[in-house]
Amino acid sequence: MTPEHLPTEQYEAQLAEKVVRLQSMMAPFSDLVPEVFRSPVSHYRMRAEFRIWHDGDDLYHIIFDQQTKSRIRVDSFPAASELINQLMTAMIAGVRNNPVLRHKLFQIDYLTTLSNQAVVSLLYHKKLDDEWRQEAEALRDALRAQNLNVHLIGRATKTKIALDQDYIDERLPVAGKEMIYRQVENSFTQPNAAMNIQMLEWALDVTKGSKGDLLELYCGNGNFSLALARNFDRVLATEIAKPSVAAAQYNIAANHIDNVQIIRMAAEEFTQAMNGVREFNRLQGIDLKSYQCETIFVDPPRSGLDSETEKMVQAYPRILYISCNPETLCKNLETLSQTHKVERLALFDQFPYTHHMECGVLLTAK
């Protein structure tokens, strides 16, 4: 695979290899055949980041080869959304001959939605001033004249200039209902929107008929907790990043959801609060003991669950675990399988043509 060529003819083979690999990794814990969810074969990434290479009067997007560290020029990127590809061409054309916008520009980040909105961030090794803002506004207006629904942001050390806004609103059809998700620039969002829809619908399917409340750790912008709210009496969710918490609160209101409570704290802190080890001012007015959480949902970082959180989740009858790293999932399962068994197993091809796998497991108490 090269940045400008996807081996789409190999899609089925690479997916089959992942299925075999996941089954092998999960063999000590389950003999289930994974439910497999396919990605679009191209234009599946909704975000992308590129370094900018200055070559005399020219400049262009590059990425670095992971093995050799050599730079690779990228003029088109079929893994990314069609909107990102349109913007890549338009941004280079708009910046190349503009001394103010191109001077010390070293990176461009793109974030797009299925609803055809975009935020483009230009990163600089220089101070950004009013002249930069004027030129950036002219570029933004020129892009919009090309029917590109785009918001521009300038970033430099300790500086962020959002010309209009630093977010876009995604609209996803999830099990017959449109979900609105505010996505903030430089915050985590699911990179493959088509796969995200399938992950949300799978999570809804495995939790249908649930009793009681749901607890979610690492909720981000509320991606899962808001979609799952329809299956539970109440949802209690934690997140540490301020922009994500603010986006989650917006998303609760935008989706007219009244049974989700977001708390800004780390999973480790929440564990201490639940166990009565510490009291937190942030929890004033929230009666943790009133929640009857029968199900806990975790979507941890690549490092997986820490040992304290492992112990905490074992107290719940049902554990729904979405993993972006099956190796750390299996490490966690060495502990979790002592008290729980795997009921459902899914493979989500979030990153086609790469080694990476995303998977989901539903665990129930033995």
UniProtKB/Swiss-Prot annotation:
InterPro entries: MeTrfase_TrmA_AS, MeTrfase_TrmA_CS, SAM-dependent_MTases_sf, TrmA_MeTrfase, U5_MeTrfase_fam. Coiled coil: none annotated. GO terms for molecular function: rRNA binding; tRNA (uracil(54)-C5)-methyltransferase activity, S-adenosyl methionine-dependent; tRNA binding. Dual-specificity methyltransferase that catalyzes the formation of 5-methyluridine at position 54 (m5U54) in all tRNAs, and that of position 341 (m5U341) in tmRNA (transfer-mRNA). It comes from the Bacteria. This is tRNA/tmRNA (uracil-C(5))-methyltransferase. The keyword Repeat does not apply. It holds the Pfam family tRNA_U5-meth_tr. It comes from Escherichia coli O157:H7. CDD domains: AdoMet_MTases. S-adenosyl-L-methionine binds at residues 190, 218, 223, 239, 299. One of its GO terms (biological process) is tRNA methylation. It catalyses: uridine(54) in tRNA + S-adenosyl-L-methionine = 5-methyluridine(54) in tRNA + S-adenosyl-L-homocysteine + H(+); uridine(341) in tmRNA + S-adenosyl-L-methionine = 5-methyluridine(341) in tmRNA + S-adenosyl-L-homocysteine + H(+). Its EC number is 2.1.1.-, 2.1.1.35. Belongs to the class I-like SAM-binding methyltransferase superfamily. RNA M5U methyltransferase family. TrmA subfamily.
